[in-house]
Structures are given as structure tokens and as C-alpha cells.
Amino acid sequence: MVKEFDRKIILEDGQEYYGYGFGAHNEKVCEIVFNTSMVGYQEILSDPSYTYQAVVMTYPLIGNYGMADDDYERDTPTLGALVVREYNDEPSNFRSTATLSEVMEKFGIPGIYGIDSRKLNRSIRDFGSRKVLITDIFTPLEEGIAKLKSTDIPTDAVSRVSCDKIMISYAETQKYHVVAIDCGMKMNIVRSLNKRGCKVTIVPWNTPAEAIVALDPDGIFISNGPGDPTDVPETIQTIKNLLGKYPIFGICLGHQIISLAYGAKTYKLKFGHRGGNHPVRNLETNKIEITSQNHSYAVDADSLNGTDLIVTHINLLDNTIEGVKCDKDKVFSVQYHPESAPGPQDSAYLFDRFIEVMEEQNNA
């Protein structure tokens, strides 16, 4: 007996894709995006940068190794929804403690499988990211489109996923003190800093500069996070007030915030960069790094003219800015994720560079 479709997604332009539900069976309006990673769905599910987004996985089989307690990037996943071609509800992995569907149901994340994910991804590629409704199969198309038109994607994503109080992560041997501004930080970033001898004090996204100064850091880190960087003017102002006072390192949203603090501008990409195989050229070494990426916005290259920033990395797929620096202020940032999780580790040296800059500052 053929199983009947019970869920569907509706795009703003009226396209419908039918499939089967897994995870939570609630209705949601999200921004639809795609990720080209073959593995790492648990890290994607728990990456705060995907807040309010429905992620379409281009790799067809998802769920086959289950969910492991030690592999979450944050304890409370905030992904909007997950769309896959084929879902495996019987994982084979000795580390697995739950199925993907069980975790999604626990956190209210709807999923749909059985759709033509290649066709859907081509639509996103050709027409860009846009709003999508994940709903019941019986929802009329007209009603679905009306919901899409009347529902805005919230702009409070960073405040939703940031910590609400100061937290500290200690290293075994503590040589440096890093204050990390949490805009939706992945825990592998904290682990990467701890591993290099950094005590990490994690502060909320809207912590003012004077409060950070009072913590007496050796360096400041600005994390990844969801949404439009212009939605966090408080964080931008904090960085403006700290430029030139401490070594500063930013990743992803943190990279965009640093650029805005120097007077540059950002813009939204047609469909973003999401995956574990994006080639980036390091302009200082002329080497190619394969990087993990997850972002909807990029720094406007022309807007860097007249600022103190210089470009250090570019994306080889579309020539967008992937890294900037200001040597006199001991500031640098990258658009991609050197901590991976998931993805390659070609760029882990950037954490070592941050250590070197803090050491130089301490010895000055």
C-alpha cells in the first residue's frame, strides 16, 4: 500500500511540494535556504545561525547516523524546519541516543521528506531565498499564500539565541582571557579557544563596551549568529567603542559586525552560502582553503574604500569578501567558519593567529 502524503510546503510564488512529515507536525513560516553538506545534520540542526530558516539538504539521505549527545552546537536547537529527500528513522551508530525525528519533535521543529529536493534547490538557486510555509497537506493554496503574505520573518533572532547572562568556559591551562560576544555562538568555537589555553567569558550580544573593559580581557571575540547584521546596532556600537583597545577576532556575523563598525556596508545574497566545501583564496598566502560556510549576508567590497580595513580572503565561487583585517587595531575577521563542525579544518590556523596577536599585545 502506497503511503499518502500528509505534509506540504508552499512558496511565496505558489509552488507546492508534497511529502511526509517527521519531527514536529506544527505549522511554520520560515525563510527557505539550502545546505550542500553531505554530513553534519546534527550540527546544522543545533547551529543558532539557522534560526527562523527552513533548511533543504541537497544530500539525499539524512538521519542515518542518528543524534549523539556530545555533538550539539547548542543545547536548544532553533532551526525553523528541515526538508530532505529521504529520511532514515532507523539510525546505525553506537554513539546515537535518539533519532533525528525525536529531537526535532522535542524542540518543535517540523520536517518533511519525500519531496523532489533537487527541483526545490534549483528553484532557490534561480529565484533566491524566500518565505515558505510548512503545513498540513489539506491547507488550501490560497490560505497558505495569504499566511505567507501576512507573516514577517522576525528580526529578533540574535536576542533569541544569545545567552542572557555571563558564562565562563575554563581551559585546562589558562594563558589568555577572551571575552566572547555571543550572537548565537557555536560551542566548537569555545572548544577551539579553550584548547589553545583561553579562558572564555561569554557575554550577551548587547553587552556595552565598558562592561567588557571591566572584565579585563586579553582579546575580544565576536561570534557567528543569525539574521541581518544591521539588526544588532548595539553590538556594532560596542565594537566601535573597543576598536584599537584590544585584539578583536570575528567569525561570520561577527565579521559583518566588525565591517559595519568600520563604516562598511553589507547586503543580502541571492541564496547565501551554506555548505562544507566553499573554496576561499587567502590573499596573503595565495593558498586555497576549503571552508565551511553559513550566511545570508556579505560585506560590500566597494564600501570598504575609505575604511581602515583591507581584504584578506575572497570566495572563488562568486568573488565575495571572505575576510578583512586592520593591522594597526589588531583586528581581523572571516566570513566562514574555521571551527568547522561540520566541515573541513583548513582554516583552524586563524585561532592560532588570534593567540599570536594577543601575545604581541601583552608583550608590547
Annotated model-derived regions:
Residues 1-210, 214-215, 229, 341, ...:
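RNA-binding accessory domains that recognize and position tRNA/RNA substrates
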